[in-house]
Amino acid sequence: MLKTILVGATGYTGAELAHYITKHPELELAGLYVSEHSLDAGKPFSSLYGHLLGVVDQTIEPLAVSNIKNICDDVDIVVLATAHEVSHDIAAEFLAQDTVVFDLSGAFRVNDPAFYENYYGFKHNFDKELQSAVYGLAEWASADIAEANLIAVPGCYPTASLSALKPLAKHGLISTDQKPIINAVSGVSGAGRKASLASAFCEVSHAPYGVFNHRHQPEISTHLGHEVIFTPHLGSFKRGILATINVKLAAGVTPEQVTAAYQEAYQDQPMVRLLPSGWPSIKAVEKTAYCDLAWQQQGQDLIVVSAIDNLLKGAAAQAMQCINIRFGFAMTTSLV
């Protein structure tokens, strides 16, 4: 079995990852780590997440950077569910110990150092690792993921958006005259587990944020190969993302071409479901690892709707897909 440690274990995504790793027949959960000053250190994991009582009861351990070499003894896989700056600082330390690193932060998603100063507010100091990192959009990068030692798991909004748009871009069906317009709403869990007034029960209201300056906009544009307009919204529900995307198609594109593009892209991809009728909903994907897609065309105008669970297909489940790809396991292992 492959020994796997999880760093940043106590966030919402960390909890989902701990459960997936524990269920995986080829992985051994060898350690759950938090920052060395975290108040969660020393607690049983299931004391934070009661639904995992009897499933993940390991003690949460503090991680000191100076101790990384010691904790990596015989470790094969490191999963980082840490803040962007933390992943930036420690990923190279784990790579130096001959582990394969799966990073769920944004620290290695775009191979351009300037991107991080502009959108994350820090200078990227690990150009070698940045250039070698593979963007882990599972259905679209399996060959590269299988050879990589640093996999940057995509963001939740980019996963929903790129899954909807990449089949069109691959076949040149998107008009160059108009940017795709993405309006997406996410559950409050996307803001993380730390308490804040903005995500408090009595304060949350469906509203846009990050207009024209959200860091996921350039991430989407970079990996799509088309500029987009992206407006995220905070919804008054726990989990899930619903993205409604308006696309101007290239002149002469037929409904048959659009359908063929999606079918070609996803006919052998078990975690993406093309709906035969109706529209994607958060209810249908909540607490699942699926991405649901549907579309409708009127002339050159196409509306595509994508739904995922932000904590799963938008984070933990996609990380597990990448682990499965990297080590040659079936794509759905531990996920369904």
Swiss-Prot record:
Predominant location: cytoplasm
GO cellular-component term (any): cytoplasm
InterPro entries named in the record: AGPR_AS, AGPR_type-1, NAD(P)-bd_dom_sf, NAGSA_dehydrogenase, Semialdehyde_DH_NAD-bd
EC category name: oxidoreductase
Record field: catalytic activity: N-acetyl-L-glutamate 5-semialdehyde + phosphate + NADP(+) = N-acetyl-L-glutamyl 5-phosphate + NADPH + H(+)
Compartments where located: Cytoplasm
Name of the protein in question: N-acetyl-gamma-glutamyl-phosphate reductase
Active site feature: C156
GO biological process: L-arginine biosynthetic process
One Gene Ontology term of the molecular function aspect: N-acetyl-gamma-glutamyl-phosphate reductase activity
Sequence similarity: Belongs to the NAGSA dehydrogenase family. Type 1 subfamily.
UniProt-listed Gene3D superfamilies: Dihydrodipicolinate Reductase, domain 2, NAD(P)-binding Rossmann-like Domain
Keyword terms of this UniProt record: Amino-acid biosynthesis, Arginine biosynthesis, Cytoplasm, NADP, Oxidoreductase
Function: Catalyzes the NADPH-dependent reduction of N-acetyl-5-glutamyl phosphate to yield N-acetyl-L-glutamate 5-semialdehyde.
EC id: 1.2.1.38
One protein family per Pfam: Semialdhyde_dh
Pathways per UniProt: Amino-acid biosynthesis; L-arginine biosynthesis; N(2)-acetyl-L-ornithine from L-glutamate: step 3/4
